[in-house]
């Protein structure tokens, strides 16, 4: 019996030791010994936060003494100052907004980032992030990745991602759609067949009356590639070694493009931005494929609406090219947690709607796009609907070797109805590959 008693005591002692080890491990795990952002249920003032911007945002705590600098373009400065003030009120972090043209921010980050002279947060168009990532200038959107992916339209996520890693906090989007003159067309045609039927009764070249126009450049003519399952580069335009411009889908799309010549009896080179803008202003052009940047040119002269592009004959929604602007965090920032918090805060549904109200920027946030303010705007809602069927314009530097040969192919195929589409595109791809190798 005594032996059994001693064994029980040893067993109990061993159990106690094991329990202590388990509890110590649990406490270590709860203490958060990783190198990630500090987690708390209080904001920078030590006050537990609400849920209006999301619970995850409230858990991150800005670094003590944090202060931020944001670069913003001229047309966005006043709006951004309001966002900075709201952020400071919520987190106790002052935000200075410095004006810098959007096209200059990436270059300035490259020169000023390593010397700690650049802004903590900046806005970049999506075709500039590849170079910035390769140079190690941007921090990934890691703390808010899951929330960002769920909240933003897919094309904006794709455009803010490089090599499988999400870096951006999408801010606004843009694509082109179809302006239509409501005095000539009370309802926008939904298919190219309907456009062709209207053109038969409306076109009068001698009077400069045309049913529809678009510029014959790669940006505006991409629908005849993407809508037919064609592509420029493989792997969602990330693999320049896989050229799809002479593939089956693109050939089908360009043959369809060639068949549309009767609805626009003009040579491709004659369809310029200035020509179609003037004709639409004069009420002679019924439909004009263009972007939101042209709204101001028409609002005082034309009773117009904006609709999605006509469906392809295969029934697919017509795929356009799009551009995306996102907030990015400078990898050299002294306050990476505060900077992440600000980028997430500024890209929220509420703030994207405020940006729309003040500047007309089209939201990248799905719920913002469905807000009555957007849905009831007959102009912006048309662009937002088309954006849902868009793909980001390729961000690879190799795309620069594509545009001129592709435009030449459009012109050959359009101006010469008997041109062999496959042979033309084979030659185009050969020219592009040669150009890529020479750079």
Residue spans of the language-model regions?
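A structural signal for short loop-to-beta-strand junctions that line the ligand-binding cleft
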Residues: 111-112, 117-120, 148-182, 209-214, ...
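Extracytoplasmic/periplasmic solute-binding protein
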Residues: 167-171, 176, 194-243, 285
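Extracytoplasmic/periplasmic substrate-binding proteins
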Residues: 73, 82-83, 129, 220, ...
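Extracytoplasmic "Venus flytrap"/periplasmic binding protein-like
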Residues: 86-153, 161, 183-190, 279, ...
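C-terminal lobe and pocket-closing loops
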Residues: 293-303, 312-408
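Hinge/lid segment of periplasmic solute-binding proteins
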Residues: 49-62, 125-177, 187, 192-198, ...
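Glycine-centered hinge/linker elements that transmit conformational signals in sensory
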Residues: 198-199, 239-269
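Conserved C-terminal helix/tail region of periplasmic/extracytoplasmic solute-binding proteins
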Residues: 51-53, 389-439
């Amino acid at each position: 019996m005594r032996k059994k008693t001693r064994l029980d005591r040893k067993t109990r002692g061993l159990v106690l030791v094991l329990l202590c080890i388990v509890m110590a491990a649990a406490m270590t795990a709860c203490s958060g010994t990783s190198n990630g952002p500090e987690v708390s249920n209080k904001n920078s003032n030590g006050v537990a936060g609400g849920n209006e911007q999301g619970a995850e945002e409230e858990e991150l705590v800005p670094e003590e003494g944090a202060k931020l600098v944001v670069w913003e373009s001229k047309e966005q400065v006043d709006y951004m100052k309001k966002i900075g003030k709201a952020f400071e009120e919520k987190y106790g972090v002052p935000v200075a907004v410095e004006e810098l043209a959007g096209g200059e921010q990436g270059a300035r980050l490259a020169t000023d980032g390593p010397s700690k002279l650049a802004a903590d947060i900046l806005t970049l168009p999506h075709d500039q992030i590849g170079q910035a990532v390769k140079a190690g200038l941007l921090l990934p959107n890691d703390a808010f990745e899951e929330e960002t992916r769920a909240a933003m339209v897919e094309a904006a996520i794709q455009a803010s991602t490089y090599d499988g890693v999400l870096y951006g906090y999408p801010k606004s989007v843009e694509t082109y759609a179809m302006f239509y003159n409501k005095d000539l067309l009370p309802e926008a045609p939904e298919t190219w067949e309907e456009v062709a039927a209207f053109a038969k009764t409306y076109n009068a070249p001698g009077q400069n009356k045309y049913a529809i126009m678009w510029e014959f450049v790669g940006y505006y003519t991409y629908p005849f590639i993407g809508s037919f399952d064609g592509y420029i580069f493989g792997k969602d335009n990330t693999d320049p070694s896989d050229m799809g411009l002479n593939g089956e889908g693109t050939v089908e799309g360009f043959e369809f493009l060639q068949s549309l010549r009767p609805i626009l009896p003009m040579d491709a080179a004659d369809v310029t931005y200035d020509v179609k803008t003037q004709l639409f202003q004069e009420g002679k052009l019924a439909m004009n494929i263009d972007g939101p940047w042209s709204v101001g040119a028409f609002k005082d002269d034309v009773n117009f609406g904006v609709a999605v592009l006509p469906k392809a004959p295969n029934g697919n929604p017509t795929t356009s090219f799009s551009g995306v602007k996102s907030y990015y965090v400078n990898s050299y920032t002294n306050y990476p947690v505060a900077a992440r918090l600000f980028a997430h805060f500024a890209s929220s549904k509420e703030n994207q709607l405020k940006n729309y109200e003040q500047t007309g920027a089209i939201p990248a946030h799905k719920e913002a796009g469905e807000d009555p303010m957007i849905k009831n705007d007959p102009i912006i809602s048309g662009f937002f609907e088309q954006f849902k069927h868009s793909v980001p314009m390729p961000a690879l530097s190799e795309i620069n070797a594509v545009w001129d040969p592709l435009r030449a192919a459009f012109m050959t195929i359009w101006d010469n109805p008997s041109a062999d589409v496959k042979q033309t595109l084979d030659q185009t791809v050969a020219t592009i590959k040669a150009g890529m190798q020479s750079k």
